Amino acid sequence: MERLKAVEEKWQERWREARLFEADPQPGRRKFFITFPYPYVNAYPHLGSAFTILRVDIMARYKRMRGYNVLFPQGWHATGGPIVSSALRVREGDPRIIKTLRDMGIPEEDIPRFRDPRYWVEFFTKAWRRDLERYGMSIDWRREFYTTSLNPAYSRFIEWQYLKLREKGFVGKGRHPVVWCPKEQKVVGDHDRPDEYAGISPQEAVIIKFRGRDGLVYPALTYRPETVFGVTNLWVHPDATYLVAEVDGEERWIIGEQAARELADQGHRVVILERIEGRRLLGRIVVNPADGREVPVLPASFVRPDLGTGVVMSVPAHAPYDYVALMELKRRPETLREYGLEPGVVESLEPIQLIAVPRAEGLLVVEEVRRRGVESQMDREKLDEATREVYAREFYEGIMLETTGRFSGLKVAEAKEKVVEWLEERGAALRIYTLPQEVYCRCGARTHVKIVEDQWFLLYSKPEWKALAREAVARMEFLPGHVRRDFEAIIEALRDWAFTHKGELGTPLPWDREWVIESLSDSTIYMAYYTIAKYTQHPEKYGVEPEMLTPEVFDYVFLGAGDPGEVSRRSGIPQGLLEEMRREFLYWYPLDMRISGKDLIPNHLVFFIFHHTAIFPRELWPRAIGVNGWVLVAGEKMSKSKGNFILLRQALDWWGADATRWAEVLAGADSGLDDANFEPSVADSAVSLLSQWLDFVRENYGRPARREERWVDRWFESRLNSTIARVTRLMEEANFKTALVEAWYKLQESYRWYLRRSGGEPREDLLRRFIEVQTLLIAPFAPHTAEEAWEAMGREGFASTASWPEPDESKISPEVEAAEETVQAVLEDAREVLSLIGGADTLVVTVAAEWKYRAVEAVRRARERGASMKEALREAFKVEGVDKREAARLVQQLSRAPEVLRRAAPRSVELEALRDAAQLLQEELGVKVVVETEEDGGSPRRANALPGRPALYAEKRGG
C-alpha cells in the first residue's frame, strides 16, 4: 500500500511540474472539452461524487491518448442558502453543526472561523481540490473558480447572462408558487434540500367543499376532481388533531395545520378558531356538491393530516386506498363500534363506477389490488404501485360513463378541467398549489407551497423556448441513448421557474438587486466561462479586473458582437487580449460532453440545454450528455448511521488513488441509470493486483524469450488486437466498467492461457507488445500505475499522453480465436468426461465432417439474412452432396445446440488448433490424446461431432 502511495505522489508531482493537463488552443488539432457539474462546497467529497467525476476523468484521459487536445476544467458551487444557514448555526452555537464539523476532523480552534460563509467557501474549495489532485484528476487548474458575488468576475458573467435572457423575452415577473421554508423565510430550491427531496415541485390540485349538516365545510384536496361523482364517504384520521378555521371570513373549515399554513401563504385569510380530535368528526354527514347525495365521515388509518387538507374524499371505484379501506371497515365492524358507529353505516356503501377503461374486466381498481395481493391499507408500497397504474390508465385511456351526467362520453383528460370549472361556478371548488409529499429544507424545517408576489421567473413554458430545447435534444448524443426520452418528457412538462431568492449567497439580479439568482439558475452556461477563466480569474497575470467585464465584453467574446477596438476602448481590456479570449472560446466551444449523476436530469441538465439554446447560436450548442446512477457501498445506500459513508479522502488513505479508482469503475461505471455498488474487497484486491503488475513489468519487459513462430502466437496476437478494438469501442460509449473488464481481466486471462499453451515460453515481441498494450489500456483507470510501468519499460514521456493502442486489423482472426475457444472447451469437457469414466488412458477427439461445416455455414448465413431458425435449418438440406438422413440428424443437433452457429472457425483451422494443442491436453489430462476426423476416425461417438464442438470418447487401450 505504501509503495503505491509513493508512486502516486511521485507522478502527481511530475504532472504538476510538466503542467501536463493545462490545455491551450492548438489550431488544426482536434479538441475535446468535457466537464463535471461543479460540486457544492460545504463538505468533503464522498465516493458518490468521486464516482461521477472519475467517469469524466477517464473519458478525458482516453481522449487525450487518442490524440485530442483535451480541456477538463473544474470550478466550485457556493450559491444558495446552505452555506449561509450553516454559518448562522455556527454563530448560534448549534450543537449539531458543531458536531458535524468535529466529525469532519476540523480542529476545535478552527471551528469559530466557520461563522463566516466566506470561510466555508475558501476552506472546502481547497479541500476539494486537494482531494481531487490526490485522486489523480487530469484537470487544468488555471481555470478554477467559485460562484457568487464572492467572485466578482464570475458574477459579472452571470449578470450578462440574465441581461441577455431578459432581452430575449425569457424572463418574467408575477405571482409564482414556490417551495417555501417557514423557518428561514426563503424559497427552497433543489440544492437547498436533502437529495431525497430533489425534483419535487408545487403541483396544482383542487379543493372540493363538502358542506356538513353541522354548518362546517369539509374540504377534500384531490388531483382527480372528475371522480367526485363516485364519492361514497369522506375519510379522516381518527387519532389526528384537526383545526376549525375561518377561511376568507366566510366559512368554517375542518383542515390540518399544514393546510392552514399553505392556504395562508397562498392569499387566503385563515383564522384558527379551535382544535378538534378526528374521532369527534366520525359519523357526521356531509353533502356531495356534485350530486347532492349525503355521505358519512369515516375513519381511515392511511390518511395523513399533514398532506393535502387532512380530509380525503373516498372514491373506492377508482382509488385503491379508498377501496381497500372501505372493504376493511366492512370486514371489521368492531372498528366502527370502537368509534361509536354502527356497522350499518358502511353496509350500503358500494363503489360507483364512473370511468370505463379498455381491456379492464369490471373495476380496474379491484383488478390491480387483487393482482398485487394487497391485504390492508397499510400495504403502502403495493397500494402506491396500484394507484400509479390505475391513475395513469384511467387518465390516458378512460372514458366517462353515464354516472357522471353531463360529462358522459368525454375522455378523462378532457373531463378533468371541465368538472373543475363546473364546480367553481357553483362555489364548490377552488384551486390550490401543494406538494405531493413532504419536503424538508436542509435546516430541518418542513416546507410548504407559498405564492410569492413580484417573483422573477424563467419562462420555460414559452413555446418558442421549448421548441429550441427540443431541437437541441434531437441533435445531441446521450449516453445511455434511452435517456433522450427522459429529456424530451421533462422539456414538455417543464413550467416557469422561480430563479431568484433572498438572503443567500449568489449573484444579485442586475436590474433588481434585492434578489439573488438561485443555485440551479447560475449554473447553466458556466462551461463557456471556463474557456476564458484563465484570463478573468488571474488579474495579476492578465490585468483583467472584474469591473472591466462589461456586458459588451461578454457580447464580443461569446457572441462576436461589436467592434473589438471599441469594446477595448470602453472596457480597458487590450484589444489583442480581447481577440485572444474570443479565439479561445471559439476553439473550445461547443462543449463536447457533460457527465453527471441521474439526479440532475430533471433540473440542471435540462436547464443547461434551455439556456444554451437561448444565448448561443446553434453551432455552439452542447454535443453530448452522459448520465450515471448513484453509488451504494456493499449493496446499501451510503449512510453515516450504517457506518458505510466513505469520504474520498478516507478511501485514498485506505487504498490509494488507483485502487480506489479501480473499485469505483468496477462498481458499475458503464453508461446507465443503475446504481453502482462499491465493494471495499474489490479495492483491497486492486492494491495487490496493481503492485503485482509493476513487479511483472520490471521482471518481464525486455527479457530474452522465444522468437520462432507457433500456432498459439497467432491466437494471442489476434486476441491482443481484438481486445484493443473492443475496449476502444467501449470507451467511446463511456461503458467504462465493461471496458476495464475487457482491458484487464479478460486480457490477463488470455495471457495466462497463452502461457499454458506455449509451455511458459511466450514469443519475445508478443510479450513486449502485451505489456505495452496492457499498460496503456489501463492508463485511464489507474494512471499512476501506468506511468510507473511506462517508466520501468524505459519509455519516453508520459503514459498519460502516449498514443492509445491501435488494433492491427490484419492480425485479428475470428477463425483462429474461435478455434482456440474450441481447444479450451475440449479441455474443460474432457475433464468432466474422464472424471465420469474411471480408468481411461486415451481420449479420442473427433472433428466433424467437412459437409457439416458447409451446412452450418449455410444455416448461419440464412440467420444473418433474417430467416427464422426453422427456415434457416432447411438450408442444411440444400448443401450439395449431403445425405438427407444425415442432414436431418444435424438439424436436430443444431436445434439442441444453437450456440454452434456462433462459432466461426473453418474445419482446417479447428483441426490445426486441436493437433497443435494435443501435447497440452495430454499433459493436463494425464491421458493419451488422439485427434481425428469424422471421416477417417473410428470413435463410436464420431457422429456426434459438430463444427466447433468435437465429439469426445474416453477409452482404455493399454500399451
Swiss-Prot record:
Motif 'HIGH' region boundaries: 39-49
Sequence motif 'KMSKS' region, location on chain: 637-641
Subcellular location(s) of the protein: Cytoplasm
Any GO BP: leucyl-tRNA aminoacylation
EC main group: ligase
Keywords, sorted A to Z: Aminoacyl-tRNA synthetase, ATP-binding, Cytoplasm, Ligase, Nucleotide-binding, Protein biosynthesis
Reaction equations catalysed: tRNA(Leu) + L-leucine + ATP = L-leucyl-tRNA(Leu) + AMP + diphosphate
Primary site of residence: cytoplasm
Region (Disordered): 933-959
Binding-site positions, ATP: K640
Keyword Ligase: yes
NCBIfam families reported in the protein's UniProt record: leuS_arch, PRK12300.1
Entries under PANTHER family matching the protein: LEUCINE--TRNA LIGASE, CYTOPLASMIC, LEUCYL-TRNA SYNTHETASE
HAMAP family: Leu_tRNA_synth_A (MF_00049_A)
Protein name: Leucine--tRNA ligase
Species of the source: Aeropyrum pernix (strain ATCC 700893 / DSM 11879 / JCM 9820 / NBRC 100138 / K1)
